[in-house]
């Protein structure tokens, strides 16, 4: 039986930290679904279609990654995709409490859904999409934190 995992997030935009997690997940699971949440309440900078396209290009070198957008409840999405593993990145202790609440709720909604937490590599442990966008808005150099295609899209968006 194939091990199918979902790595959900807003990915507004996808960063090298996200790529670190998804790349490592591809070594642990047969199929990884990078599930990009519509998240209209977060007022994303990039549309869902833009985020999906950026992530598809950034992960094209990974053979077992599928990038899809979604707006459903995560447990329902996982059930529909026949996945029973959720991958979540934990940057710091501050992330853990929220992630624990999500894991418990997801397990309540779908008892066979396991959450697997991965720590990003030290190089990426302090970055987030929000922080990268904020630095870029103030003309800070964020080249190191983003895949090339995403960096260009962010610069174009901020013009």
UniProtKB/Swiss-Prot annotation:
ATP binds at residues 10-11, 18, 89-91, 99, 124-130. GO terms for molecular function: ATP binding; pantetheine-phosphate adenylyltransferase activity. It catalyses: (R)-4'-phosphopantetheine + ATP + H(+) = 3'-dephospho-CoA + diphosphate. Its EC number is 2.7.7.3. Pfam families: CTP_transf_like. Its main location: cytoplasm. Keywords: ATP-binding, Coenzyme A biosynthesis, Cytoplasm, Magnesium, Nucleotide-binding, Nucleotidyltransferase, Transferase. One of its GO terms (cellular component) is cytoplasm. It is found in: Cytoplasm. InterPro entries: Cyt_trans-like, PPAT, Rossmann-like_a/b/a_fold. Substrate binds at residues 10, 42, 74, 88. The record marks 18 as: Transition state stabilizer. Its cofactor is Mg(2+). GO terms for biological process: coenzyme A biosynthetic process. Pathway: Cofactor biosynthesis; coenzyme A biosynthesis; CoA from (R)-pantothenate: step 4/5. PANTHER family: PHOSPHOPANTETHEINE ADENYLYLTRANSFERASE (PTHR21342:SF1). Reversibly transfers an adenylyl group from ATP to 4'-phosphopantetheine, yielding dephospho-CoA (dPCoA) and pyrophosphate. Homohexamer. Belongs to the bacterial CoaD family. This is Phosphopantetheine adenylyltransferase. It comes from Salmonella typhimurium (strain LT2 / SGSC1412 / ATCC 700720).
């Amino acid at each position: 039986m194939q091990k199918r995992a979902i790595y959900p997030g807003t990915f507004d935009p996808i960063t090298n930290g996200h790529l670190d997690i998804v790349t490592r997940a591809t070594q642990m699971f047969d199929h990884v679904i990078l599930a990009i949440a519509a998240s209209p309440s977060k007022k994303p900078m990039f549309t869902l279609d833009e985020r999906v396209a950026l992530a598809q290009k950034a992960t094209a070198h990974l053979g077992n990654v599928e990038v899809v957008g979604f707006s459903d409840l995560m447990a329902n999405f996982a059930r529909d995709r026949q996945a029973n593993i959720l991958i979540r990145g934990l940057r710091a202790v501050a992330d853990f409490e929220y992630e624990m609440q999500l894991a418990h709720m997801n397990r309540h909604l779908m008892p066979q859904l396991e959450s697997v937490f991965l720590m990003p590599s030290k190089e990426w442990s302090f970055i987030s999409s929000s922080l990268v966008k904020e630095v870029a808005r103030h003309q800070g150099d964020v080249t190191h934190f983003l895949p090339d295609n995403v960096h260009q899209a962010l610069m174009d968006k901020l013009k």
